[in-house]
């Protein structure tokens, strides 16, 4: 017992006598450990900055997800089933990075007719289509008139076939000028073939413009309010109607009528980082396959997975130099520690031999 106490006394005395060298060794060890342990954290921080920079310099609408189902019959039940399927896939795969979602429906093209004057025919025959946007009121300015109302549900066949029956719609300013119509005027859309050919009258209750034509809400579409055309082309009228009107009236007036359905999901790029990038990429590809299997002719458009692949391909070119520098510094510190330790051992060699 006394021998052990004597040994500890010698250790304490010699440590106090050589505290400068021992402190140097201890500091060197701490620095080496801290440097090596922080290298992965520093690497992740650089990776996050690189990915964030890449995402911020891309067009956000191309990063957002657009699920589209073209040329589908307009059927409320089928639409609800498709929406539930898409929502299930989104929730299962990428919900954490989604900050907003909207829907957009665009009908097939119809022949358009005036009710107060002759309508040009042949190659100059005006045309038009219906559009439905969720939360439209938050993104438009009503220049004249009032916000549209939905056609009542449960309309009878007699009511629908009434020659005076009409639905309410809104039209863009530029399109209204092309058609020379205003609030209170009517347009008639005609479509279908054979026995299913029919006409639907639209009362224009508002002339509208987008609050911001470049808003992400419009998904880079430049023909929402007016369709660009040449001077020799007939005008086309995009008419905005409510979703209730679309499903309550459209399928009965145009039994063969079809539309393209779009589900839009806006990505929060702040929630995409180097840690979850691989998971997001795989989730998008998995979701695309599942939708194509369960929703025929549908598609998923986004460049987010391509950006992640491109980012991962460039990643090693930044990681390799970083880790080479870190290991070089760590090697220098270790060399320094070994040198100082040898000096300390040489200095205390006499005491160790005596002990």
Where are these regions (language model features)?
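Interfacial "coupling" helices/loops that link adjacent transmembrane helices in transporter permeases
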Residues: 46, 335-355
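Membrane transport/envelope proteins' first extracytoplasmic loop
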Residues: 1-331
């Amino acid at each position: 017992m006394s021998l052990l106490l004597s040994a500890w006394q010698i250790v304490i005395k010699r440590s106090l006598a050589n505290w400068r060298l021992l402190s140097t060794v201890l500091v060197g060890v701490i620095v080496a450990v801290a440097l090596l342990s922080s290298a992965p954290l520093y690497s992740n921080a650089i990776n996050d900055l690189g990915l964030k920079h890449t995402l911020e310099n891309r067009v956000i609408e191309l990063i957002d997800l657009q699920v589209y189902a073209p040329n589908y019959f307009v059927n409320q039940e089928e639409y609800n089933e498709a929406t539930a399927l898409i929502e299930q896939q989104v929730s299962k795969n990428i919900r954490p990075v989604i900050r907003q979602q909207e829907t957009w429906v665009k009908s097939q093209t119809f022949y358009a007719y005036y009710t107060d004057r002759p309508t040009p025919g042949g190659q100059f025959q005006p045309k038009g289509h219906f559009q439905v946007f969720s939360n439209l009121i938050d993104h438009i300015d009503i220049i004249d008139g009032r916000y549209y109302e939905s056609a009542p549900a449960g309309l009878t066949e007699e009511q629908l076939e009434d020659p005076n029956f009409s639905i309410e719609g809104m039209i863009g300013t530029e399109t209204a000028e092309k058609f020379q119509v205003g609030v209170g005027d009517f347009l008639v859309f005609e479509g279908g073939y054979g026995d299913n050919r029919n006409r639907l009258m639209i009362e224009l209750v508002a002339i509208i413009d987008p609050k911001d034509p470049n808003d992400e809400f419009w998904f880079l579409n430049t023909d929402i309010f007016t369709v660009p055309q040449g001077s020799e082309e007939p005008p086309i009228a995009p008419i905005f109607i409510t979703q209730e009107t679309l499903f309550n009236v459209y399928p009965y007036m145009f039994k063969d009528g079809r539309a393209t359905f779009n589900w839009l999901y806006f990505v929060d790029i702040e929630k995409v980082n180097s840690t979850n990038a691989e998971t997001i990429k795989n989730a998008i590809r998995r979701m695309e396959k599942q939708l194509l299997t369960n929703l025929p002719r549908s598609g998923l458009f986004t460049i987010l997975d391509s950006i992640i692949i491109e980012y991962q391909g460039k990643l090693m070119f930044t990681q390799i130099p970083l880790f080479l520098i870190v290991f070089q510094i760590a090697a220098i510190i270790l060399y320094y520690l070994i040198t100082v330790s040898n000096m300390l051992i040489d200095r205390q060699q006499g005491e160790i031999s005596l002990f």
